[in-house]
Amino acid sequence: MQHLRPIRRALLSVSDKAGILEFAKALVERNVELLSTGGTARLLAEAGLPVIEVSDYTGFPEMMDGRVKTLHPKVHGGILGRRGQDDTIMEEHDIRPIDMVVVNLYPFAKTVAHPDCSLADAVENIDIGGPTMVRSAAKNHKDVTIVVNSNDYEKVIEEMDNHQNSLTLDTRFDLAIKAFEHTAAYDSMIANYFGQKVAPYYGDTSQPSGTFPRTLNLNYIKKQDMRYGENAHQQAAFYIEENIEEASIATANQLQGKALSYNNIADTDAALECVKSFSEPACVIVKHANPCGVAIADTLTQAYDNAFKTDPTSAFGGIIAFNRSLDAKTASAVIERQFVEVIIAPSINEDALPILATKPNVRVLACGEWQEAKPALDFKRVNGGLLVQDRDLGMVKEENLRVVTQRQPSEREWKDALFCWKVAKFVKSNAIVYAKNDMTIGIGAGQMSRVYSAKIAGIKAADEGLEVAGCAMASDAFFPFRDGIDAAAMAGVTCVIQPGGSIRDDEVIAAANEHNIAMIFTNMRHFRH
């Protein structure tokens, strides 16, 4: 049963007026009476549409600079009145049924995002009447339609045309859910903003805020359900942020292949965020959230070839990310050489698509171009709580780099050291990366002791016949003992880049000098757990 409800009267009051004029015209053409307020009413009247000001309907003027517009029983009675149950009381008080409410709220997020926003500015952009009408209409969705998103205007008109100016209960219920999500997100923004304020300062300028709110309110939109989670016995879904500003796995458009799995998404994110660190043509191959091969080169194909050489065994069934549009030559190299789960790039050249289509199960994603990384929060759930930190966007600056050994790095060693330092940031701790001539030659990831990560990196290089002699080594954190340097020297490393800061730095530096290794301190750690 559809539980149709006809639309005879609608109240329109929107801050974002995109599409509202066309929507209002469509309603008038379908004999819907329009009620409206403030700027929305003026817009409709200037367009020649018949509209009744809410103040004329209620007999009560807007007041207090617009703070009080719709907070009146004749408005909320018309929205909340239950058809067939409250009709007598509505008639007694001349309350007319309002069948549709079209509302979106004051632009609070846009206001507080401005660097000069004061607390007073923020307060004036807290909508009161809007959320009240939205929640009232959503509560009474059995009889009333609530529309909070302009993307739904066309859908509403189409359904009215299909049902003699009526809407189904399924549609009203779906729109009510969107409405509650809308007001929840709005209240969360306000709570987060006020929760960061250290004092009720009402000056004309913005006030310094705390980093984190007292109560953390998060709103994410479900993009897709997964077949299962990290393991087959776990259920999972993928949620994304609203209004994403940075190219990412969340913005990616899948061009071909099977549905992305939970692990695909996690690994693709790791690969993409790593490859975005490089300005030169670059390729990153990831397996189980760790880079197993990274390279930069003059061409994308050469970058892929060199990244693959690091660890061909681990690259099998991996995730491959590029920071340039994927061309046909590089696509051919990948498809002809290896089994791959996911390929992601800013875009895919037209001539590469038929080549990729020969392997229809390969997931191919285009995420769009990116500029600089945006500040954001990272989360890690622990049992009973949530760890929150700002995103690791730390970049070493030249003035912070310090050579602490007797020997200075050569120009080639400098370049390789800075290259593998970028990679180490994206390797699970304890992380050790060997690099030479713009490519990784060995990666030691996730070991409980740093010296074993160093040994593993050397073993990886030896297994693939890659020459370690003269290479650079990066460590994501300081060496607590000299044994890591001794292991690196034994493998053939000639330059080390690491944060420094151990109580045994002198011992570690002495070991580097003994082995004639150049060592650079960055004064920045990049743990990744």
Curated annotation (Swiss-Prot):
Domain annotation MGS-like: ranges: 2-148
Listed NCBIfam families: PRK00881.1, purH
Transferase keyword on record: yes
Metabolic or biological pathway: Purine metabolism; IMP biosynthesis via de novo pathway; 5-formamido-1-(5-phospho-D-ribosyl)imidazole-4-carboxamide from 5-amino-1-(5-phospho-D-ribosyl)imidazole-4-carboxamide (10-formyl THF route): step 1/1; Purine metabolism; IMP biosynthesis via de novo pathway; IMP from 5-formamido-1-(5-phospho-D-ribosyl)imidazole-4-carboxamide: step 1/1
Name of the molecule in the record: Bifunctional purine biosynthesis protein PurH
UniProt entry keywords in alphabetical sequence: Hydrolase, Multifunctional enzyme, Purine biosynthesis, Transferase
Pfam families: AICARFT_IMPCHas, MGS
MF-aspect GO terms: IMP cyclohydrolase activity; phosphoribosylaminoimidazolecarboxamide formyltransferase activity
EC number assigned by the record: 2.1.2.3, 3.5.4.10
Annotated catalysed reactions: (6R)-10-formyltetrahydrofolate + 5-amino-1-(5-phospho-beta-D-ribosyl)imidazole-4-carboxamide = 5-formamido-1-(5-phospho-D-ribosyl)imidazole-4-carboxamide + (6S)-5,6,7,8-tetrahydrofolate; IMP + H2O = 5-formamido-1-(5-phospho-D-ribosyl)imidazole-4-carboxamide
Protein's UniProt keywords contain Methyltransferase: no
Similarity section: Belongs to the PurH family.
Gene3D superfamilies to which the protein is assigned, alphabetical: 3.40.140.20, Methylglyoxal synthase-like domain
GO annotation terms (biological process): 'de novo' IMP biosynthetic process
Any one GO cellular component localisation term in the record: cytosol
Domain remark text: The IMP cyclohydrolase activity resides in the N-terminal region.
Record gene name: purH
